[in-house]
Structures are given as C-alpha cells and as structure tokens.
C-alpha cells in the first residue's frame, strides 16, 4: 500500500475567521483499489488531475472516494470520479439531508 498527499490543505484568515481547503490523499492498495480521501474543491480540479497524473493515474483509476464531511472543499471534485464508489458516514449523510427544522447541534450529533 502507498499513501501520497496529492493536494495539501491550506488554511487562511478572512474577515469571518479561519477557513481553508482540504488535503486530498491517495491510497493505492495492493489489491488494485485506488482510494481518495476527500477530493478537494472544484477550483482545484486541474491541480488534482495533474497530481493524479504525476502519480501515474487518471480519475477513472480511482475506485473509491472517502468523504470526511460534506463541505465544498471536500466534495467539489466528486464529478471527476463517476466510476468510484463514494463512502460517507451515515450520520453525515442524514444530517445533510435534514430540513432546517430538523437540524441538531454538533454536540447532539456527537453522542
């Protein structure tokens, strides 16, 4: 198994506080599974494709994409990986699909 950082996350300060862009990690397994952990924001699609190419891969070679959470900087490039199985925590998916009247605090979701 090989683990390689394809895109390095970048935090930065705005007038609203600290924000940032996610790190994208490639996990190339010995059994021909190629897994991405998060896939970055749409604005870095070209850089992600170039990083995959440097690693000897194309988007079609990715078999799985693990999404840590559904923020724009973690899911923006999902359309590049239409052949991949998408893996996401059930609680994250259910939370994202709630109407505003059903939203819970982060503390409630943690327990």
Placement of each model-derived feature along the sequence:
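Active-site metal-binding motif and surrounding structural segment of the metallo-beta-lactamase
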Residues: 45-88
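Short hydrophobic beta-strand that contains or immediately precedes a catalytic carboxylate
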Residues: 36-38
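Short, surface-exposed connector motifs at secondary-structure boundaries
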Residues: 30-34, 56-59
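Metallo-beta-lactamase
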Residues: 88-111
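Zn-dependent metallo-beta-lactamase
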Residues: 1-32
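Short, well-ordered secondary-structure micro-motifs
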Residues: 16, 78, 97-99
């Amino acid at each position: 198994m090989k683990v390689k950082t394809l895109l390095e996350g970048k935090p930065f300060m705005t007038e609203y506080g600290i924000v940032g862009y996610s790190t994208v990690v490639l996990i190339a397994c010995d059994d021909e599974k190629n897994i991405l952990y998060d896939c970055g924001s749409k604005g870095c699609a070209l850089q992600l494709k170039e990083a995959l190419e440097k690693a000897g891969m194309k988007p079609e070679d990715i078999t799985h994409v693990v999404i840590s959470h559904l923020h724009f900087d973690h899911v923006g490039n999902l359309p590049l990986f239409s052949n991949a199985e998408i893996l996401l925590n059930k609680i994250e998916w259910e939370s994202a699909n709630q109407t505003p009247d059903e939203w819970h605090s982060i503390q409630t979701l943690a327990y």
